[in-house]
A protein has these predicted regions:
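PLP-dependent aminotransferase class I/II
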Residues: 1-46, 50-53
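Short secondary-structure boundary/capping segments
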Residues: 5, 51-52, 75, 91-94
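Alpha-helical elements of Rossmann-like donor-binding domains used by nucleotide-donor carbohydrate transfer enzymes
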Residues: 14-15, 32, 39, 72, ...
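Conserved PLP-binding catalytic core of the aspartate aminotransferase-like
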Residues: 33-34, 47-81, 104
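PLP-dependent enzyme catalytic core of the Aspartate aminotransferase-like
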Residues: 79-80, 91-123
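Beta-hairpin "wing" of winged helix-turn-helix
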Residues: 88
Length: 123
């Protein structure tokens, strides 16, 4: 029996109706993302001027340590490598602290990002 679910919106209701059809693909995609997040976290730990905070999200929050500041690292990555990251200094709770936010993307993009950081580290 089809029963309308009144406590969620129509988009969520539609998703619930088709979830079983795509459940295996969804679970596979989630696992692929988790695997890439774990791999990327290990790669980021190669960077001496970053302290990577644990996450369950689709991004990392990292403390930037000398010789860089969050603002300087953000500027260098954009100017030299066309990579834009979030300097979290504008966040009220992180004001005055050197934190950045890094999106987790695909393996190729993530490796390019790490290579850029390694280049900055080795200069």
């Amino acid at each position: 029996k089809d029963v309308s679910i009144w406590n969620i919106n129509s988009f969520a209701e539609f998703f619930m109706q088709i979830y079983n059809k795509y459940q295996a693909q969804y679970e596979k995609a989630c696992q692929q993302f988790i695997d890439e997040r774990n791999r990327f976290a290990l790669r980021l730990k190669e960077i001496h001027f970053l302290r990577v905070l644990p996450t369950q999200a689709n991004y990392f929050c990292c403390e930037v340590k000398p010789p860089y500041t969050a603002a300087e690292l953000t500027k260098q990555l954009l100017a030299r490598f066309d990579i834009m990251i979030k300097d979290c200094n504008s966040k009220t709770s992180l004001k005055g602290l050197n934190y950045i936010r890094i999106s987790i993307r695909n393996q190729v993009d993530n490796d390019y990002f790490v290579a850029a950081l390694l280049s900055l580290q080795n200069q």
